[in-house]
């Protein structure tokens, strides 16, 4: 995959050269920011599988969007928002299905724990598929 670097640079006395203010490495899902005020390089690594899927998808289908987000210094905000929204959307969808699915409700009423857990897991995987299609692979 790719490594994106911002056009804006700052001098790093530690490295004794100009370094990009922002960098994104889609392989290791890490954003690096060189803070010119403190002269410190700060990194944030993402671990969610859907962030990896989104970065790899975006890298191959719309690299200009990633390049723009890195250049504008908005890549961390963008990925944090995606992480939060996807993490909230999956359980919200699962909850909706649990409220409306008659098989699940019958299992709850009868106390069939095996069926409750099985349907709950099924709902999670179904929700991931739907949410990923709508929010990750765009």
Language model segments and positions:
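Ligand/cofactor pocket segment of small-molecule handling proteins
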Residues: 2-19
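Long, non-globular targeting/processing and low-complexity regions
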Residues: 1-2, 28-36, 121, 129
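Aromatic-anchored, charged helix-turn/loop surface patch used as a conserved interaction hotspot
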Residues: 54-111
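C-terminal charged interaction modules
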Residues: 99-138
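General structural signal for secondary-structure boundaries
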Residues: 1, 45-48, 103-107
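Short N-terminal mixed-charge amphipathic segments
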Residues: 18-74
């Amino acid at each position: 995959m790719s490594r994106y670097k911002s056009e804006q640079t700052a001098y790093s006395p530690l490295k004794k050269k100009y370094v990009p203010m922002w960098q994104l490495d889609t392989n290791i899902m890490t954003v690096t920011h060189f803070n010119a005020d403190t002269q410190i390089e700060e990194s944030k690594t993402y671990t969610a599988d859907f962030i990896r899927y989104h970065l790899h998808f975006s890298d191959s289908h719309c690299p200009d969007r990633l390049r723009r987000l890195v250049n504008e210094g908005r890549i961390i905000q963008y990925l944090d928002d995606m992480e939060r929204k996807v993490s909230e959307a999956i359980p919200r969808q699962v909850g909706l299905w649990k409220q409306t699915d008659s098989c699940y409700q019958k299992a709850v009423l009868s106390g069939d724990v095996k069926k409750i857990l099985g349907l709950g897991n099924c709902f999670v995987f179904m929700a991931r598929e739907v949410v990923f299609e709508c929010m990750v692979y765009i």
